[in-house]
Amino acid sequence: MDAAQADKAASSPVEAHAEVAALLASGAVGEAQAALDAALARWPKNPKLVLVKGEVLAKASPVQAATHYASLTSDPALAPWAASRLADLLPLPTATAEEAVALMEAVCDGAVDRPIKEPILDALLEAGDDAAKARLIEIAGSKSKIFKYESKLAVARTESGDFGGAIAVLANARAEGRLSVHAAVLYADLLASSDRLADSIALLEEIYAQNPDHADLSRRLTMMLQRARDFDRAAEVFEQAVARWPQDWMLVYRLNRLPIAHDRYERVLALLLEGAGSALKTNERLRFQAALAVLHADDPTRGFELMEAKFTPPVSILAVPVQKALKTRDAKAWRSASRLVDDRTKEVQVTRSPDPRGTVVITTGITFGNLPLAFIDAIFAAQGFNVIYLRDFGKRVYLRGVASLGASEEETIAVLKRMAGELGGKRLIAMGSSSGGFSAMRVGALMGADVCVSLSGQTALASYLDATRVSAWNPNFFVKVQMEREGDLPFDLVPVLSRPSKTKFLQFYGADDEEDTRQALRLKGIANVLLIPVRGVGDHFVVDHMIADGSFDALLKELGT
């Protein structure tokens, strides 16, 4: 600096800042830049000068100015001012993906408080293409310590199949006290899908104890306890839910499928009916499910009464076939003719006929169609069949066997063949509805049954989920991922049904149900397979229609000859 320049130079940082600001205000950007450079050479760490540099840069390049401000956020003393000025520059439509990533990293690493950090991150996440946004979410979710972005990252990793990475994000958020109740449900699903069922249950128990009025927590905990076969605790949680939400028809729907001891079932049902009150008259979904629940209990007459009134769409689609099926016998006849007192906590139950025409192995869930198993047994009893009722609490459509019969599918098949031989009867039949239909075809084929009957059964379970929406909040997404991870399991019926065999395979399906038709037609052309479309049926419960029109009784008569 020569003598003349020294005479003109500012005598203090304050004076220099004022000079630069005045030059900027007058539009003399070049002179402002020169004055600032001279001032910074003398006072390189002066806060006002460092900050006003961003204003100078912004005149030529807002992106350069934003980068400058972002770099200043590492200084706790400057961070509030720099972050505020950075926020004023956003959005930056001309920023490249790399520039946006650099800004995101600097702000996340900087000493920026959440009230100003969050709008900056939100604005940055709006920029760029999907690939850039994925990188930005990765940075925000792993570095910001703001749960909104951690949640986004956990969801993104989940939907990309990186369950371990998603678990790591949520575990860290939980350890640092940021995990939301909603995200805890996702965390539990991820743990359960990663062979950590005990950890999933422990998490849900802890969060549920803190949030007993959160319905989704109650549902998930009940479901996980069922999967772990802790039926007593599952029933406790379910009973608490009924006490809180007795008019929730979905609760009654789940009650109809809950593995629960008979005495507790009666108590829960009484609690539910008492709490439902007048909603039983005004809510058709609730009335239909409550009617099925009562039929499962020891009061078929009341179940018939609840089913008596008219149902309208969409409830009528399921309810009307059940109404018609029930009318094929009176209420007392259904119960008196049945040999089964259904214990839903048992995997294997057997009913016998004195002079059996054959033995039927039924691979079922909780129900067979929409009627209680005890009612179904009345039909088989009338036709003189022994029945072996199976449940698969492992939720693997019997492909890993039934635990109480064997440690594998092979061991289970061997025990079932022995049981069927001991029960007697000249014919061995396997039968199931929906996923139970898939299982009946496979189990029957492996047992060497005379006939296998699938009622609206899938033929390729994985393809049944082809249209599953990829979403961390879609339960079927986890089902599909789990199936893909268990690729060694034979989820396709075509190979086993294509083997040389004397077994006859009958595939019944609703002729007007698009997906069931697609599944059935996969078996077209296989020897010994007979495809039987049921005309006028456009839903998944073909068995209810067949019971209603008498064709199910006719089928059993034919099978027994």
Please give the residue ranges for each predicted region.
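Structural motif corresponding to the intra-repeat A-B loop/turn of tetratricopeptide repeats
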Residues: 26, 59-60, 93-94, 127, ...
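Single-residue signature of alpha-solenoid repeat helices
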Residues: 32, 65, 99-100, 132-133, ...
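The feature captures the conserved acid-bearing segment of alpha/beta-hydrolase catalytic domains
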Residues: 471-533, 539-544, 550-560
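Short coil turns that delineate tetratricopeptide repeat
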Residues: 10-11, 44, 77, 111-112, ...
